[in-house]
Amino acid sequence: MHHCCAFPNAFFYQQEQLQPVPCSHQLETALDYPEPSEDVFDDQLKQHRVLFLPADDEASLVADVLRRLYRQIGSERFDAAHSIGVIVTYRHQIALIRREMMKLDIPALLDISIDTVERYQGSQRDVIIYSLGVQNATDLDFLTSNCFEEDGRVIDRKLNVAMTRARKQLLMTGNRDVLCRNAIFQEIIHRYSV
């Protein structure tokens, strides 16, 4: 099972033995990030296909992750339409993230898609950064408002869509303390935090 789809398969599809179409990116065992690491955070990005990154200032963290990924992918291989995408919960996050990206002075990054889950449905990127944007209980209620129960399981459609948009790597950012109030996000944080 592809790393980015294992959680949705287990939690939302009741392990219905979904089999991915055998594509080359699904068979890769390591991420192709050849540049030397700047620090331990780079090492984490290189080692994990799915990773939860705790953050209070998500826009700054997302911009920093974009800078690091761009450095690893390299200007020759980077393609804004395929390499990286950012999914957000709230439209106002787009402006916050773009403002932080402008500070990086990397013009190629300005062309990446940053949009809500609904707008990402049907498209994919090699790397997806999902900025959850949850700072309080009200935000968490909004984030999980599309959940429903089926056969005794809680299914979160937005989370399912977001987690299955990544071809190679899924990075999620958010407020750990608030997200842990929800059983599904608590499990994600437990599985994918380092």
Language-model regions, residue ranges each:
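Helicase-core coupling region on the C-terminal RecA-like lobe
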Residues: 1-68, 123-125, 161-167, 171-194
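Feature representing long, continuous alpha-helical segments
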Residues: 2, 60-64, 91, 95, ...
